[in-house]
Amino acid sequence: KLDSAMTSWVEDSLELARRSNGAFDPTIGRLTRLWNIEGDNPKVPSKQEIKNTLKDTGYTKIHLEKVETQNTDTTKKNVDKDRKDNTDKNGDAAKDTDNNTINSTAQNTADNMVNNEADNTPDNTALNEERLETTDKKINTDESVSSIYIEDQCTLDLGAVGKGIACDVAQNYLKQQKEVSGAVIAVGGSILLYGSKADGTNWNVAVQNPRGKDGEAMGVVSLSGTTNVSTSGDYEKYFMQNGKRYHHILDPSTGYPAESSLISVTVVSDNGLLSDGLSTACFVLGKEKGQKLLETYGAEGIFID
């Protein structure tokens, strides 16, 4: 059973994947681990390794179904029908696999992810350590529930928006603290600006120079009210091989680090998850397509090439 928070995170992630045409994809966790860019001895995987791993990715292999109270057989039939319709729509015949339902481990994983998000190393991210487990047990409860069905060997990994989710969770908490009128919370490359400053002036967020030294800023963004700012770039997590930079932002369509001519994207949005995910998607898409994507969400961005 997935509660409303976890369901919302999955829904928003899949919607972003659809709108970006897969430039953001929450199923490439295995590909990220294959590259192991933050490991001790990263190296470029072989073409065959990347090809084999890509076969197990693809956001269209994730099916989220909200299920009202009904008997198990009816629930299974409805979800199977939804899977078939979705597969036909995308023109990609799904392989014959068991209809696995994510059990309550998914919710525990989500909670752990938020609690441990300060450690943003892929191998230490809770959602990477404790993979979403599946079981043949079907959920039958008196409450409305959500079930996830994952095809083949695909895995769902919300680590790519984990920092943004942490900001959203923090914002919800701050809303309940009447004595807090303003706060700044930074989680890796994502920042929550909450409320207002005590002196009434705007929040000022520095935009780092991707090729500068010691966190040198190349500009400042002035913002008011509650908002989220997330940055994705090629300059903090990367390795060099044969004179070429291999960064951690992978293009789900190729399996290799994205090559869009951009070196940094900063996104401003009222939603933490979206600011985090959009910065990644825009980096992969490039400036022109990235700007169009931001417009569909009413978000703003800074593109550096």
What positions do the PLM features span?
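Mature catalytic core of soluble alpha/beta enzymes
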Residues: 1-305
